[in-house]
Amino acid sequence: MLTFKQIKRAIIDSLTPELLTAQYRAGLSTDDPVETGHCAVASEAFYYLAGGKAAGFMPVVCGYSTHGGDALIFDPAARTQAETKGAARETHWWIKGPKNGIRGGGDIFDVTAAQYPFAFPYENGRHTGFMQPQQKPSRRAQVVMDRVVQKLGAANLAAYRHKQIADFQKAQRKNRLHKQPRI
């Protein structure tokens, strides 16, 4: 059975500069980790490969501002003030897994964590949906997913996805049984 670590490695190995938006591609440095700027597309690819909503996964985004090498600014008022002085508006995306049948209540799955030289402050994130209103992978995420399928195999990924979904559904049933009133 595949692990998150194996899927993460395959996603990272599938990231290429043409998948970046022009804004991020222009800001890349040759010594940046390959993950830099790919957080949304990498998180989206993992979300769908792992079973998405049916498996209890939840996208999370965190907005912040930064000015050069300065610290990240999360407070909304401070962000607005910093942005008027030239600070860049940024976001970071990751996925939260399920816990005890609760969607998005568990572990953090951050495919692109290595783009930060410190532990990202995940407590500043908020649950969200992806930017695709059709509830399907974006074109860029689909490119990454297709590359991951080639690396790891469709059957292996399907087994991982089905296990995630089955485990989440089992936990939900167990949760419902414990919440039923006793007669």
Residue map of PLM features:
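A structural boundary/capping signal
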Residues: 1-182
